[in-house]
Design a protein with these regions (language model features):
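Divalent-cation-assisted or electrostatically stabilized phosphate/pyrophosphate-binding catalytic cores
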Residues: 147-169, 173
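N-terminal transmembrane signal-anchor/hairpin module of polytopic inner-membrane proteins
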Residues: 1-2, 6-33
């Protein structure tokens, strides 16, 4: 049992290191070829890549569906709408619970989908943005504290915590100043 746990943890480390590494290499390779062909082509491709990294519109659209459902259609429809953006059971949520779930999701996804990617793109361009998204996506997929992923996804979850630390501090500090 102990060996199995250790083996899962080691395999999780390998995955958590390889995925962002491969993502960075592929992204840098594509950009290097584009910039080699023509600097304008490189700039256009990198701009498109950076745009694709940011998750602004879908977050707004889905959260507004929750708002309109609460306002116009009632709690059952709002539960359905909020279930599309949260990873928890929404079947027993009241109006307050639905609102809280939506606000928490918007706040977290603003950090994960906008603030942190912008932070990494500011310093490392599209490569930094894609590497960040690879780490963040791994956490979303295997960073759970359940029997299946507890040991395998632990390193990916910690890695996500580390890469989000500075952007999150900047985001919360700026929000507190408002």
């Amino acid at each position: 049992r102990q060996m199995c746990i250790r083996d899962r943890y080691k395999r999780g480390i390998v995955l958590a290191v390889l995925i962002p590494l491969i993502t960075g290499i592929v992204t840098a390779g594509i950009l290097a070829v584009c910039y080699y062909i023509n600097i304008v082509l490189g700039c256009v491709v990198e701009t498109i890549m950076c745009y694709q990294i940011l998750a602004v519109k879908s977050l707004k659209t889905e959260s507004m569906k929750v708002y309109y459902a609460l306002k116009n259609e009632g709690v059952p429809q709002a539960r359905q709408a909020v279930s599309m953006i949260v990873g928890r059971d929404t079947s027993q949520l009241d109006e307050h619970g639905i609102t809280r779930a939506a606000v928490e999701t918007v706040a977290e996804n603003t950090s994960d989908g906008v603030v942190a990617p912008l932070f990494y793109m500011m310093f490392f361009g599209a490569v930094g943005g894609f590497v960040y998204k690879a780490v963040n996506t791994m956490d979303s997929m295997i960073g759970y504290k359940n029997d299946k992923y507890l040991h395998f996804g632990r390193f990916a979850a910690k890695m996500d915590d580390v890469v989000n630390l500075i952007p999150c501090l900047l985001y919360t500090s700026d929000a507190a100043d408002e």
